[in-house]
């Protein structure tokens, strides 16, 4: 996608905030535990390579991604740390993963038997076995299949049994009932293994923040890197998470609309008195949700309502008085003591903060501050 460097809209990513969030979490961990930075989905929209570098600087000892392509991109950028692909990879790429020293997630024995002929003992494939303890997504549910896979990995020099893990569905909720059920299922399955792999891990950001007693020796730290609360506003984190992303723009146009004039597609907003309306060059093609009509942005410390439907490339706001083109607009971030968070946007849109940042498209340039890394 073409990046819009010749318009005012920018995503400003704070390297210092990312480093601080990672360091704060590492300080809470057992000395024997490692933190792998989850940088999938273009670093939750913040930029894969820059975020990987910042987290590496802060003490992350490895990375988690969703797909093999993300892992290969990290390798091509020169990262030598361990990389775990959390999703299931097509078995035909097993040899490539082994060659690039990328660890893969496996959830059934058949995958291993199909992969084995492609592999060599000189370049063994590192494997983490996924356990489905209640997420209903991927992994072994019963001990028989788990132990069959573990035995194959242990006895075949073409594999390295590197890890076993699960993922919790409700670690960010107040009611611990289902979480505790998953913990119990995980321990019962792992306890059947005659020999444990190097990594036994369960903790995403939410688990590590609110259920640290469950931490294994590897933490998959994700949304916390970016300063977002995985529970939204349901639970308070044990330390202040520093938001790493600001979405800013400028007024591209400002005009006085007379009483009775309407704004945007569908004419869903009609001014009831003469009003100053500003246009901001950002829209749903940039990942700013179309449903945010009625939400607000910040101009000069004022909350300004988004009026009319959000367009593909532009949106309109009601101004308290005249402002010239070029006036700063904060869509997410701070202005004169007031703020709009990604969670605020998500709550209005009926979704979660992760989806908001992941949804910002490449058309919005990412600008990095507090670091000398240039995209």
UniProtKB/Swiss-Prot annotation:
This is Alanine racemase. Its cofactor is pyridoxal 5'-phosphate. NCBIfam families: alr (TIGR00492). It catalyses: L-alanine = D-alanine. SMART domains: Ala_racemase_C. The keyword Isomerase applies. The gene is alr. Its EC number is 5.1.1.1. Catalyzes the interconversion of L-alanine and D-alanine. It is an enzyme of class 5 (isomerase). It comes from the Bacteria. It comes from Limosilactobacillus reuteri (Lactobacillus reuteri).
